[in-house]
Amino acid sequence: MQETAFIWDLDGTLLDSYEAILSGIEETFGQFAIPYDKAQVREFILKFSVQDLLVQVAEERKLDVEVLNQVRAQSLAEKNAQVVLMPGARDVLAWAEESGIQQFVYTHKGDNALTILRDLGLESYFTDILTSQSGFARKPSPEAATYLLDKYQLDSEKTYYIGDRTLDVEFAQNSGIQSINFLESSYEGNHRIQALADISRFFKAER
């Protein structure tokens, strides 16, 4: 399966990090006296993104979104220890490596993602790790995928973006690559999973 490539999302896919993210947002909101509703915030960031949330709040409250971002990034960095692996994450990464599948990361997380992956002993699985600070347009723009496809001469029909949100499926579709996702989608290139262990089963069945 040498021609196969995986591009991974992190939050909610490889990393069980939403509690740490929500806690960081709560602290940030508290510093600026912004009301915090955990259920509403969770629903919003799953549908859109944390950045979209901060932009909206900054506009509503006449705040500087960059300041909000800095406070949140600092708060989140202090919560790295709360971030754990999703069930089966290490196993599927090891299986992919043993199967000759090239692996990459494209995440909306900042460079703190590198620290987390290093701390969890996962960094060596990836050929390249792109974060929100790598300079690419945010998902669902295909810019980051196009960069990886070109730089590493990847086959778009055998390259999969693995994520947990509709935004991730849209990113794969816009990029002309396959999608593996925890959600159903009308995109014919999407393959739904319920657990990370389903990925190796899917590829073994395809052989």
Regions flagged by a language model, labelled:
Residues 8, 103, 159:
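Short glycine- and Lys/Arg-enriched binding-loop motifs that mark or flank ligand-binding interfaces
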Residues 79-84, 108, 137-138:
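Short, flexible loop segments at the rims of nucleotide/cofactor-binding pockets, characterized by
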Residues 2-87, 91:
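N-terminal helical cap/lid subdomain that shapes the substrate entry/recognition surface
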Residues 35, 102, 178:
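Residue-level detector of anion-binding/catalytic polar loops
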Residues 1-4, 30, 66, 94-97, ...:
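Asp-based, Mg2+/Mn2+-dependent phosphohydrolase catalytic module
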Residues 45, 49, 87-88, 108-109, ...:
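Short beta->alpha linker loops
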Residues 14, 85, 105-106, 161:
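Conserved SAM-binding loop
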